[in-house]
Amino acid sequence: MPTINQLVRKPRKSKIEKSDSPALNIGYNSHKKVHTKLAAPQKRGVATRVGTMTPKKPNSALRKFARVRLSNLIEVTAYIPGIGHNLQEHSVVLIRGGRVKDLPGVRYHIVRGALDTAGVADRKQGRSKYGAKRPKG
């Protein structure tokens, strides 16, 4: 416990809040080739690699992911939610924040039903999260 005198000489530092999705808080000026501060809810990017990854213990699965080069030239790993997808290398995707707890290093989700990503087929409930259209009839 510091004394009052010690606190007067050197006050306490306030905690720095760290972003959960730092790549969304950076923009890029391509004319000046410089990164800027520009917070965005989503960002567009190009898939450079699409594959599967195994989760941490105690879970077991093959989780689908894509390595995405964003419009601000930062490369991130993003999770592809839902059953089945149509993504390939060079697909243009939209990413949002949101980590996947059992995949280390995955801090972003790909938005289904936006840009080149198709919505999940034959989905009846929770459709908006997976870009599925309303079934007819």
UniProtKB/Swiss-Prot annotation:
One of its GO terms (biological process) is translation. SUPFAM superfamilies: Nucleic acid-binding proteins. It comes from the Bacteria. Keywords: Methylation, Ribonucleoprotein, Ribosomal protein, RNA-binding, rRNA-binding, tRNA-binding. GO terms for cellular component: small ribosomal subunit. GO terms for molecular function: rRNA binding; structural constituent of ribosome; tRNA binding. Residues 1-21, 34-57 are annotated as: Disordered. The modification 3-methylthioaspartic acid is found at residue 102. With S4 and S5 plays an important role in translational accuracy. Interacts with and stabilizes bases of the 16S rRNA that are involved in tRNA selection in the A site and with the mRNA backbone. Located at the interface of the 30S and 50S subunits, it traverses the body of the 30S subunit contacting proteins on the other side and probably holding the rRNA structure together. The combined cluster of proteins S8, S12 and S17 appears to hold together the shoulder and platform of the 30S subunit. Part of the 30S ribosomal subunit. Contacts proteins S8 and S17. May interact with IF1 in the 30S initiation complex. Belongs to the universal ribosomal protein uS12 family. HAMAP family: Ribosomal_uS12_B (MF_00403_B). This is Small ribosomal subunit protein uS12. It comes from Streptococcus equi subsp. zooepidemicus (strain MGCS10565). The gene is rpsL.
